[in-house]
Amino acid sequence: GLKNEDEIVTNGTFTVDAAAQLQGKKSMMNKKGGKVMTGHENHLGMEKNTSSITISFNKNERIEVSEDFQNQLKTVFNAYIKLKDALVKEETNKSISASKKLLENISKVDMKLLKDNETHTNWMSLVKEIKKATTSISKASNIKEQRSHFKNLSLNLIKAIQIFGINTKVFVEFCPMANNNKGAYWLSKEEKVINPYYGDKMLTC
């Protein structure tokens, strides 16, 4: 049977088990435990221990929700990917459009699909932060400011996907040099690193 720190399987596919990976526990992509090496730790001679930046969760196990809710959350993720791609290309106007689409999609997520108070509370706390960061991106006039807010959006969407799951494979990626060398995470549909925090300057960092 599955333990809390093991992989999460949903309808034959798995969601990224970010908490397990980043805390060095066993996961689908890290069967034996221990820190997951992202390939960026020694980039440009810099050594950055991913354990210095952790994503905290109230629970390490995923909360069971309906497939309908997961599908609605997936539309938010898809809008996020378009926003991420716009940031990679440093297209400020497209970033604004994508952030507005993300806000539209998240407003359509039906909270009535969450059956108990704990699940509802978890979602409400995350959606508040997601909306706050995304709204800030939609109002930002330059790419640097957009990327700053994207960091917070990413952290909270990672948490949401970890807790509730979506029926697709998702990768959590990390750049140790972003956020003034404090590092920053983002989500991707592919394992290949394409950096939204630096664009052409360090595209594969």
Task: List the model feature ranges, each with a label.
Residues 1-205:
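Intrinsically disordered, low-complexity terminal tails/loops enriched in metal-binding residues
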